Amino acid sequence: CIMHNVFEKGDRYFNTGDLVRDIGFRHAQFVDRLGDTFRWKGENVSTTEVENLMCSYHSLAEAVVYGVEIPNTNGRAGMAAITPHEGMEIDYAHLLEHLRKEMPSYAIPVFLRQQQKMETTGTFKYQKNNLKKESFDTNATHGEPLFVWLPNTDHYQLLTAEIWQNIQKGAYRF
């Protein structure tokens, strides 16, 4: 994202989402990532951008995106907790089709967790820490349905105990 007029009129600033430190001699040193991002397939994924694109889908009321670890992979895969608009059903095949048109494949959540209501703090911020901790473990998600976009498929499917075990064993190449 290139921003204009950040420090002075006419300047340009390339927002990488990285925090760097000036170590002198015209050198910068990487310190950390800013904002809520994760790295998947060698790319930085902005959770806010993915959430906004997901919420452009007609039947989704809310989306909370975060990164989760998959055994035998590098980085964190995208996962989204989603809630439908009241009285609406989510067509998961159509949702994936929509997401594939709107964003690069590395940014599309691999896992979805359908919730009736999002947990929020007293200041109405989403509770991502519990979602991250529970990850895509079917035993930790309180019976809420989980879906997975398996490699070489064109749809989300229900995450069963058998699929979960195969993911843990590294049977799929994400």
What are the roles of these predicted feature ranges?
Residues 3-107, 117, 122-126, 130:
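AMP-binding/adenylate-forming catalytic core of the ANL superfamily
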Residues 133-140:
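Short arginine-rich
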Residues 113, 132-133:
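Nucleotide phosphate-binding site architecture
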Residues 103-126, 143-171:
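AMP-binding/adenylate-forming catalytic domain of the ANL superfamily
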